Amino acid sequence: SIPGWESLLEHACGECGDGVVLGLGTVLTNEDVSKAIDLGASFIVSPYVSQDVMEAATIEDVAVIPGALTPGEVATAYNMGADMVKIFPASSVGGPKYIKSLLGPVPDWELIPTGGVTPDNAIDFFRAGAAAVGIGTNIAPADKIRSGDWDSVTDAVRDFMDRLNRQLEEGIQ
């Protein structure tokens, strides 16, 4: 949904090389799935369960991570071939407690909470059973992106990862 995403993805894939796995979100159409794969994306994230996007990702043999909120939507996503499911907006519906509740009856679901995940609460989502977290404006604010202040964004990402890794080393329990 970002204008010019194609050149950004191509540049990122070229800069990062094989050691980094890059994907693309927010993917809304099967045409964008094909473009993203051609440019080097290894996975696709969509904001909701889209049959077209799911089928295109399956045909392209790349991981697909649709967005969902309710247990029924999550089940539908997995029934359609999702590799993981993005839960959005996680913090607005109970945060880590909601993730734990979703996983209660189906502990095998791999959920990625997004929306309101911060450096302060990310570990709580992992403790609740999240497979990964999605964090955006809390470490990469729009004003920093617009101004091209990549050093600040890089520092914030590094700080977040260092903090999270320390917490993970201390243990999830």
Model-derived features: positions:
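CE4/NodB-like, metal-dependent polysaccharide N-deacetylase domain
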Residues: N79-M80, R163
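Generic C-terminal helix-cap and adjacent flexible tail
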Residues: R163-Q173
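Short helix-capping segments at alpha-helix termini
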Residues: G14-V20, V106-D108, Q167-L168
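Hydrophobic faces of well-ordered beta-strands that scaffold small-molecule active sites
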Residues: V20-G25, I44-S46, V64-G67, V85-I87, ...
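Active-site-adjacent beta->alpha loops and helix N-cap segments on the catalytic face
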Residues: S1-C16, N30-S34, I44-N79, P89-P105, ...
